[in-house]
């Protein structure tokens, strides 16, 4: 469960572009990575809620928030939202690669909404995502 006693902080990491430091992606046995599909807002909301995000909001409210925030950008979701899915087609983890506006107007790449269902943590799903 997400420890809400730890204050929230944005973390900015920079990479020097040295490809030699990249590690291969190792997807845990029994999982595959897949991109967003129509209707995945339900999976996204369920995973985020199970990971402790969105506090007292219901699952339906969390899904509605997602649709309000990202619903008009479904084309971008198809290549910016990634799910870890078990062989029985259960989505157990999610992350999004998005962009944020910088103070100078530039677009800054952002990895956010990385979450794994509590029952599936510790299996390498988050690392693969």
PLM segments and residue spans:
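Acyl-donor-binding surface of acyltransferase catalytic domains
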Residues: 1-29
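Residues that form or immediately flank small-molecule/cofactor binding pockets and catalytic motifs
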Residues: 18, 38, 102
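A short beta-loop-alpha structural element at the N-terminal edge
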Residues: 32-46
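Extended hydrophobic-aromatic, low-complexity segments
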Residues: 44, 104-109, 120-124
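A conserved beta-strand-loop-helix scaffold within acyl/acetyltransferase catalytic domains
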Residues: 49-116
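Conserved acetyl-CoA-binding loop-helix of GNAT-fold acetyltransferases
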Residues: 113-116, 122-129
């Amino acid at each position: 469960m997400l420890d809400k006693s730890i204050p929230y902080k944005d973390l900015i990491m920079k990479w020097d572009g040295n490809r030699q430091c990249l590690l291969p992606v190792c997807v845990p046995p029994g999982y595959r990575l897949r991109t967003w599909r129509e209707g995945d807002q339900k999976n996204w909301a369920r995973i985020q809620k199970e990971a402790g995000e969105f506090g007292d909001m219901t699952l339906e409210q969390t899904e509605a928030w997602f649709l309000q925030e990202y619903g008009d950008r479904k084309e971008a979701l198809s290549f910016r939202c990634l799910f870890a899915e078990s062989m029985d087609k259960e989505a157990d983890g999610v992350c999004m690669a998005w962009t944020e506006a910088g103070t100078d107007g530039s677009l800054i790449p952002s990895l956010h909404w990385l979450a794994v269902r509590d029952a599936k943590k510790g299996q390498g799903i988050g690392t693969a995502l």
